[in-house]
Amino acid sequence: MISLGCGPPGKRAAGAERMPQFSTTRRVRHAAADMFALVADVERYPEFVPLCRELKVRRRVAQAEGVEVLTADMTVAYKMIRETFTSKVTLDRPRMRILVEYLNGPFRQMENHWIFRPISEETSEIEFFISYEFRSRMLGALMGAVFDAAFRKFAEAFERRADLVFA
């Protein structure tokens, strides 16, 4: 299921009603723990994530049991446009959730989360949600359609990667 303009109730940032949003829930033929590990392996994103050209983890801190918090810089590029943004990434293994909180870069706001639900030992349901608003109207006009198209391919890129890694 792919739905535009909606996300989980109560989870939107202030002003999110006008922000571009994308959400999808997909059933995959891989274990939830495997899919969590794949998405949590952010250093590998440049190998397969649309628009991602570089990703550097600046900081990695273990918190509560099974919870790790990263500060990461992601560089996205399309043609002549190249932008880097910094996010706080909370990897919550016990709850099978990944929360991405925007810290700095070309956005006014951005929020993103992943939720992994086991269906069986070999099947899981993955929820992906993102909403964002560029700081610059010009950049938003240039990159908005490109980002929309990339996010539609995002979940597929992770599914293809899982098929390759867990085959």
Locations of regions flagged by a protein language model:
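Short amphipathic alpha-helical signal-transduction/dimerization elements
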Residues: E43, F151, A155, E159-F166
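Hydrophobic pocket/interface hotspot
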Residues: M35-V39, Y45, A72, V89, ...
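Beta-strand/loop substructures that line and gate deep hydrophobic ligand-binding cavities in soluble
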Residues: L99-K153
